[in-house]
A protein has these predicted regions:
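An exposed, glycine/acidic-rich loop-and-rim segment of catalytic or binding clefts
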Residues: 1-154
């Protein structure tokens, strides 16, 4: 996985509500600016990962309305690759920490961390954080955003 973000929004505890800070990913297990396996640092002794049982954090992408690549992902086993692009200011990366035991299509077995999500968004709790970009749309205004996920073989 590669996430094109220099910062993330730390959370206060296991509730995963952001503290209101924006923190650099540099030198932390949160740093996905260079492609790495999701599991490489997921068990690191890092408070933010302890709070959420792994990755479940918002990454700071830039100003809303600016289209940018938010993430790339690649599976070596299948050769399937993903390029995700958005004009949102944040992306929530969730590493499937609490999937539990599930049976899927064709009897496939799914368990904790057998999948991940990249969810374009405003920062969580932004309505209560004056320094975060505002997600409020006023009556009569129109809101539009665009996120695309392109899958291909690499």
């Amino acid at each position: 996985l590669q996430i094109f973000a220099d910062a993330y929004t730390p959370v206060v505890d296991s509730s995963a509500i952001p503290t209101g800070e924006i923190a650099s990913v540099e030198g932390t297990p949160m740093d996905f600016r260079t492609e790495k396996q999701i599991g490489q640092d997921i068990r690191a002794d890092f408070e933010q990962l302890h709070f959420t049982g792994g990755y479940d954090h918002n990454y700071v992408l830039g100003r809303p309305g600016e289209k940018k690549i938010m993430a790339n992902a690649y599976c070596r086993e299948s050769g399937i690759a993903l390029e995700a692009e958005t004009d949102c200011c944040g992306v929530q990366f969730y590493a499937g920490n609490f999937i539990g035991e599930q049976t899927g299509k064709g009897g496939a077995s799914y368990h904790d961390r057998s999948a991940f999500c990249l969810e374009s968004q405003f920062y969580p709790n932004a309505v209560n954080e004056p320094d975060f970009p505002s997600p409020v749309v006023k009556a009569g205004d129109t809101y539009h955003t665009e996120t695309s996920y392109r899958f291909y073989l690499r």
